[in-house]
């Protein structure tokens, strides 16, 4: 068995004890609130981890792109999949319907009638009904219909099209009070219209902490929580000890007393900054700041640290955004007790179509 200290750097590691505890904790939390767990696999992109989540009690999985569904369907991870992306174009809708014949319970989302029309035509050609959810923008300002009235109007339009079957509403992320108020207005509208809402799907790892404020939710989709990252820690919903993904990187240069350079740049750590002050958190030197990245270098300011690393020292960096790091590498090292227990190919890496 390979020792973790023998791994060449940069190496993306996942501490298995931490990840397994994260999976159990999230499942238990949602079980307590009687909300179904539908984890988002875009974070890990690894079928073996998806199977762990299913074994822990998840009702199904969430995928963001068709390529992810294809990989996870090939691996037999789940019979129940929600694809949370507008699918457009004949090539994609053909792939979608091929998947619909393979995955017993495959549902999609949509937020406009152009998508509904194309999905309907594909479903009609395939002679296979396609369940769908209406995506609702409840404050994130990305995709989604803008009001409960628009949600109802689109649901009526889409339901009138052959091959489409309305199942419910979804959003990302849950925001209080916006999400609650949106659904509190929407659900009576659908009831009066005679359109049963079977599913109300929320999402987001930080939003796990507030699911009790949304009694209408039937399921929750969270991805980052399987690993956690600096962004989640900054939101107050995880601790550094609960961060399973850690990038091992070597100090390759110390040009000044305050400055150190690591061999993990933007091609590993990702340049996602969000509201963070640096590009990752160095566990051994918590006062350090990963000040900036180039492709193969991370420049770290150790000025606030009482101790400074030497050239050749290996450090562990919790990335800002673990989902992107996963898509940067071919394989992830699962470690336990200082040894590499498993090496997982990132099977859905690059499946962005």
Language-model features, listed with the residues they occupy:
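Conserved, mostly hydrophobic/aromatic
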Residues: 19, 42, 72, 134, ...
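Active-site loop/helix belt of alpha/beta enzymes
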Residues: 131, 137-239, 243
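Active-site-proximal beta-alpha core segment in soluble small-molecule metabolic enzymes
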Residues: 40-178
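N-terminal glycine-rich anion-binding loops that anchor highly charged ligand groups
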Residues: 18-51
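C-terminal helical cap(s) of enzyme catalytic domains, especially alpha/beta-barrels
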Residues: 73-78, 232-241, 333-334
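Generic N-terminal amphipathic, Lys/Arg-enriched alpha-helix
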Residues: 1-14
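C-terminal accessory subdomain/extension
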Residues: 256-353
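Flexible, glycine/charged-enriched surface loops at secondary-structure junctions
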Residues: 36, 192-199, 311, 326-329
